[in-house]
């Protein structure tokens, strides 16, 4: 089987992290975001994976060659000379996707969930339609495009309603699909949207179904959602693989700690914390609902909550970081500094407080 991952552009929503590392390689729970997807596709029997990108593939090539060997898959880049939206990339990769005339998966690279690829493929074959969308239930459907089903046929999609004012349903498109190769014939090689241009044709043909996703789902393409997705992932891990979570007197709730990290016995971590490789955590440090990426240091008695600390960064003593702050690569926060919602660009040193949301350049 084959899969296409829509990687797209510059990952601007996840800046300042993506100023240094392409978004698919930013670590989510200590593994590159895209690796979660490659592993799930490989486990479902996918042998050919296409990454649809429109910048910096050369940075990713080396890392992904390693995964090819590890997971026994072939990974190719489909490079767009202009952004082609969410449907154009399928046309561009037509050769690979039509290779053996079997259905193929399409997924948005920002989506984190318990990927149900095997079950999705079986469901798709059983209903005989041309496409299946994975649907997830949400609490506030009025913020999304909602899937409305055909009354007579289970799971057959009747229409989509964009940001409904009245309740029509609570299932939304989760950004994962399986499609038959003939769907590519409906797409032109130009910037085009699968949601707005391709799916309505399949709905008209009564050939588009939805598959309900069990468990958590999150689009982690921006810092707030990256942290929320981390909470969901850790919660899921506590049920599926509790042995992967850290244990100890100074651990509260769900925490992942890389074995190479050095953590003071008087520091307290959790709930919902990820500590990357070669991180150093000083005495009396308190970290909650945060991610500390590799090679960073949090010095004594600092408080870090709802924050992403980028690679090679240093947080001084008695600092307080909160409010969805993000430190880019190689940032230094001097002693006793307060940062609330600051986005600090790479290679900056800050010695003044950042009391409200701001970009520090």
Swiss-Prot record:
A single Gene Ontology CC annotation of this entry is:
cytoplasm
Q: A single GO BP annotation from the record?
A: cell wall mannoprotein biosynthetic process
Instruction: Name the Pfam families on file.
Output: GMPPB_C, NTP_transferase
Q: Which spans of this chain does the record mark as coiled coil? A: none
Q: Which UniProt keywords apply?
A: Cell cycle, Cytoplasm, GTP-binding, Nucleotide-binding, Nucleotidyltransferase, Transferase
In which domain of life is the source organism classified? Eukaryota
Localization per record: Cytoplasm
What is the reaction catalyzed?
alpha-D-mannose 1-phosphate + GTP + H(+) = GDP-alpha-D-mannose + diphosphate
Residue pairs linked by disulfide bridges in the UniProt entry: none
Kindly indicate whether the keyword Nucleotide-binding belongs to this entry: yes
- Enumerate the GO terms in the molecular function aspect: GTP binding; mannose-1-phosphate guanylyltransferase (GTP) activity
According to its UniProt record, where is this protein mainly located? cytoplasm
Which SUPFAM superfamilies would you find in this protein's record? Nucleotide-diphospho-sugar transferases
Pathway where this protein functions: Nucleotide-sugar biosynthesis; GDP-alpha-D-mannose biosynthesis; GDP-alpha-D-mannose from alpha-D-mannose 1-phosphate (GTP route): step 1/1
Could you tell me the EC number(s) of this protein?
Answer: 2.7.7.13
Q: What does this protein do?
A: Involved in cell wall synthesis where it is required for glycosylation. Involved in cell cycle progression through cell-size checkpoint.
PANTHER family assigned: SUGAR-1-PHOSPHATE GUANYL TRANSFERASE
Annotated family: Belongs to the transferase hexapeptide repeat family.
* Official protein name in the record: Mannose-1-phosphate guanyltransferase
């Amino acid at each position: 089987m084959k899969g296409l991952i829509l990687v797209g552009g510059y990952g601007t929503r996840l800046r300042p992290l993506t100023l240094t590392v392409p978004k698919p390689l930013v670590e989510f729970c200590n593994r590159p975001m895209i690796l979660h997807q490659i592993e799930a596709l490989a486990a479902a029997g996918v042998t050919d994976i296409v990454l649809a990108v429109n910048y910096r593939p050369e940075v990713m090539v080396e890392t992904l060659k390693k995964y090819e060997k590890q997971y026994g898959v072939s990974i190719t880049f489909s490079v767009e000379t202009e952004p082609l939206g969410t449907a154009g990339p399928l046309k561009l990769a037509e050769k690979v996707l039509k290779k053996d005339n079997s259905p193929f998966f399409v997924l948005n690279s920002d989506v984190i969930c318990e990927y149900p690829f095997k079950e999705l493929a079986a469901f798709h074959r059983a209903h005989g339609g041309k496409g299946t969308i994975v649907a997830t239930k949400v609490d506030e459907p009025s913020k999304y495009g909602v899937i409305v089903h055909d009354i007579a046929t289970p799971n057959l999609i009747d229409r989509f309603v964009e940001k409904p004012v009245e309740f029509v349903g609570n299932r939304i498109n989760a950004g994962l699909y399986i499609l038959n190769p003939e769907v590519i014939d409906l797409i032109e090689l130009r910037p085009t949207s699968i949601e707005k241009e391709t799916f309505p044709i399949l709905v008209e043909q009564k050939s588009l179904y939805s598959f309900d996703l069990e468990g958590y789902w999150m689009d982690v393409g921006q810092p707030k959602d990256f942290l929320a997705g981390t909470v969901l992932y850790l919660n899921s891990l506590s049920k599926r693989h509790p042995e992967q979570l850290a244990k100890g007197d100074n651990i509260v709730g769900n925490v992942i700690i890389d074995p190479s990290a050095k953590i003071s016995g008087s520091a307290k971590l959790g709930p919902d914390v990820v500590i990357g490789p070669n991180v150093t955590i000083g005495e009396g440090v308190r970290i909650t609902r945060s991610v500390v990426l590799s090679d960073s240091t949090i010095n004594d008695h600092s408080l870090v909550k709802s924050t992403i600390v980028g690679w090679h960064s240093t947080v001084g003593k008695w600092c307080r970081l909160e409010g969805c702050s993000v430190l880019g690569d190689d940032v230094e926060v001097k002693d006793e500094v307060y940062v609330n919602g600051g986005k600090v660009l790479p290679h900056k040193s800050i010695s003044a407080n950042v009391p409200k949301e701001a970009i520090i350049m």
